[in-house]
């Protein structure tokens, strides 16, 4: 997994003061990272246009232009007059190297931005408020085949809020380390592929300790059956309580069985199970089992059962969906449980604990709110769903950006609850269960050719093939 930071000012300051890497060295390495991206995505001789701003982000662009000129048809548009000392220095160096630099004329109709690669080096991490009208990157980038953002696409602020005219990159090179603003739900459509641009020193030397991490494909640890002398009891008993909409719980149960649980049982609370809708591989119980490894409640549920508090004492659990609308869920916040709400459900839970905020406030501050909640309830693991999933525990937050839009379909969350339950029943810690189930869920969604057609049962089949 990769370290994530809200800002990297402290990292740059340390690199300069402790590692004796000057601003010039850092900027040259940033330009080299951008240069590698151009070389990987365009042939020699291709037309490359670089949009440069007035600060150090613009300086990166001018340094890049100097490195490309002679091998590519390189053109720089000066979107704003160079102001920072490093930007001015890099602009002069670019001019001396023969780079063509044109002033961008806001009202000029004949400026041709058709190119093979368009690179945004305009604002970077200093964006606040709204973009100036002439910086409408949606129209500026229409004729570019491939678009690269330097550090942060212009129009995304430090909280991950996005201006409607923001630069929509195919690739973002985050300089030095990953910034948290690039991982917001709203930024997902603007960042494209995300890579780190190393600034002249190995990233683990450049970085400082952090409480925020980005999950990678390599972090997934699938269930392992490495013993030959074993039986079903060695792999846990997972129990799913079915609500009024029984299909949701049945999906969770099938998902848990497919992810390694030795036994999966179900119990109807608000529904009636007939012989026509009984999956043969599940064990159907009339009562809550005395011996079990973990249970899940909430999928398709309308009311909290009266024995809920007693069940919390018997085994670890996954709580989802319907439970977050009932005050009885508060009993679980002092137990080792995994909560898996989507934003609307999380708002309801926050209201129950006395935090009244709007959906807009939640989406604008999702990372901070999830972290604060996990610190207030240290026994709980919170998995907050969204375009990017947040997993928070005791102040640490793990961000999963691996999933696809294919998961935006009823039943996907029920499958996820089942995956978490399965790992919990197999003696994974609650945090490891949430992280690995979320990763498997996301990666399986990428295996489907047509993202509009994925069904929950298809998803379970793909999970079996990981």
UniProtKB/Swiss-Prot annotation:
GO molecular function, one term: metal ion binding
Binding site for (6S)-NADPHX 2: 300, 414
PROSITE patterns: YJEF_C_2, YJEF_C_3, YJEF_N
Sequence segments annotated as region (NAD(P)H-hydrate epimerase): 1-207
Residue span, YjeF C-terminal domain: 215-466
Catalytic activity: (6S)-NADHX + ADP = AMP + phosphate + NADH + H(+); (6S)-NADPHX + ADP = AMP + phosphate + NADPH + H(+); (6R)-NADHX = (6S)-NADHX; (6R)-NADPHX = (6S)-NADPHX
Gene Ontology terms describing biological process: metabolite repair; nicotinamide nucleotide metabolic process
Region (NADPHX 1): 56-60, 124-130
Cofactor remark from the record: Binds 1 potassium ion per subunit.
A Pfam family per the record: YjeF_N
Amino-acid positions noted as binding ADP in the UniProt annotation, renumbered to this chain: 385-389, 404-413
UniProt xrefs under InterPro entries: Carbohydrate_kinase_pred_CS, CARKD, Nnr, Ribokinase-like, YjeF_N_dom, YjeF_N_dom_sf
EC number: 4.2.1.136, 5.1.99.6
Record-listed K(+) binding positions: 57, 120, 154
UniProt region (NADPHX 2), positions on chain: 342-348
Binding site for (6S)-NADPHX 1: 151
Keywords tagged on the record: ATP-binding, Isomerase, Lyase, Metal-binding, Multifunctional enzyme, NAD, NADP, Nucleotide-binding, Potassium
Region of interest (ADP-dependent (S)-NAD(P)H-hydrate dehydratase), ranges: 215-466
Cofactors named for this entry: K(+)
Residue ranges of every copy of the YjeF N-terminal domain listed in the record: 8-207
Regions crossing the membrane: none
The protein's role, per its UniProt record: Bifunctional enzyme that catalyzes the epimerization of the S- and R-forms of NAD(P)HX and the dehydration of the S-form of NAD(P)HX at the expense of ADP, which is converted to AMP. This allows the repair of both epimers of NAD(P)HX, a damaged form of NAD(P)H that is a result of enzymatic or heat-dependent hydration.
Recorded family membership: In the N-terminal section; belongs to the NnrE/AIBP family.
Protein name, per record: Bifunctional NAD(P)H-hydrate repair enzyme Nnr
